[in-house]
Amino acid sequence: MKTFTITVKKTEGFKKFEVPVGLTILDALEYINKTYGENIQFRSSCKAGQCGSCAVMINKKSKLACKTKVEDNMIIEPLEGFDVISDLVVDREPYYKKIGTLRNYIQKKNEKISEKELDGLKLYPDDLKDVKKIRGCIDCLSCIAMCPARKYSNYPGPTLMRQLARFAFDPKDEIDREKEAFDENIYNCTTCGRCVEVCPKEIDIVHNAVEKLREKTFKKGYNLDSHLEVRKNVLSQNRSVPKEKTSFLEEVSDEYIVENEKMRVAFFTGCLVDFRLQEIGKSAIRVLNAHGVSVIIPKNQVCCGSPFIRTGQTDISESLKKQNLEIFNKLNVDSVVTLCAGCGSTLKNDYKEKKFKVMDITEVLVKVGLIDYKPLDITVTYHDPCHLRRGQKVYLEPRKILESIPKLKFIEMEIPDQCCGAGGGVRSGKPEVAEAIGKRKANMIYATDADYLITVCPFCEYHIRDSLTKYLKEHGLKKDIPVMNIISLLDKVI
């Protein structure tokens, strides 16, 4: 009989077991108890992925034990973020109590409704279209176990915010759910997408619950002053950050054409490359040209709108989107290329009317073919930006690039796609939350003892650099780990 080895975390510690190939994790736990005489405690009920009771951590990700097939060397642990009662059983009572405080039922301002008023409450399918998208939750709590904002701040978690959204979107409910959402720290969510990634019912909590609820919350006047400052920036200069020096778009030419062209792209710069990280933008041009890619740079492009979509300010984001669509839809290029994870995710997922293809710069480089790079004898680790890894499903390309540089040693950190804490308006709106989440990321980076931290997102660059600096001082460490954009790295070896 062919077997796999799995490790189960019991109350007294980890223990390894041999189990037959082909079982689910739930089957394997039952097999272990029966075959080895163990008494591992775990929850289960329907065994069909409908009750949500069997969720556990499998290789550091929350999944349903009844729907996950055993693989060799899997590690099974109780859900993170909850007190453990015994073995794989966690205490769910705090969650249920919190749900109770959120008035988890439709409420009317006036319980006594006249027949005339009742007649006016007729609903049609379109009235509940937003509710339908988020009501399939089975309370497995997988999203809560993975949520960085819930772990490191006073944020109730994705599914509780989903519940508030469910009632806020229901015309029958008349309570001020937006005020409840604001009081429950809806702006603590980094929109990292971990909850979406692990949801067994594939509920898009980020886009269909949190961001839509933030839009309603903002319209009711429940907002953060710092988010309004970002709003002022874009209204005055079409960028989300203040201008500090000559912009990238002012410094460069309209186009950089190469002979024997493999591909022609339009460069969407984003706010940080244009106003803060001009040298990375110039590196991008050189790197693309070196790979046989011609670069067109539209000078009248504006902010992609991501900071405003994420924080509920959709009146601003729609205006910005319209301007960019008018510019980029007219271009005769193979693709629009982005150097920012947030910009790329926004263009790919939120620009529904686009007539152009969008690619991250690492996707472009791998597609046209990597070239022979000069050797570079350094050790690096890599951070997956949330809006690249989960927002665009791009994670192999950066690794292919790093592994193609001679003498460069690439090592993975513990959880490379763990959120750094900067996204979703959290760095500007809730800096203390961003700092708390960033501290864990810094710990993972320092544990690798790498010479450099490499990433692809300018926003992540800024925040991780700040997190590492604070971590260095807090722990009295002498070794600094600089943060470098993968394009800056390539500019050194082309």
UniProtKB/Swiss-Prot annotation:
MF terms from GO for this chain are: 2 iron, 2 sulfur cluster binding; 4 iron, 4 sulfur cluster binding; electron transfer activity; metal ion binding; oxidoreductase activity
| Pfam families hit by this protein | CCG, Fer2_3, Fer4_8
Family membership: Belongs to the succinate dehydrogenase/fumarate reductase iron-sulfur protein family.
The protein depicted here goes by the name Uncharacterized iron-sulfur protein MMP1067
Domain (2Fe-2S ferredoxin-type) spans 4-82
Organism field: Methanococcus maripaludis (strain DSM 14266 / JCM 13030 / NBRC 101832 / S2 / LL)
> Which residues bind [4Fe-4S] cluster 2 per the record?
147, 189, 192, 195
> For the 4Fe-4S ferredoxin-type domain, which residue ranges apply?
127-157, 178-208
Q: Which residues make up the binding site for [4Fe-4S] cluster 1?
A: 137, 140, 143, 199
Q: Does the keyword Hydrolase apply?
A: no
Where [2Fe-2S] cluster binds, per the record, is at 46, 51, 54, 66
Listed GO biological process terms: tricarboxylic acid cycle
Keywords for this protein: 2Fe-2S, 4Fe-4S, Iron, Iron-sulfur, Metal-binding, Repeat
Is the keyword Repeat assigned to this protein?
yes
Top-rank taxon: Archaea
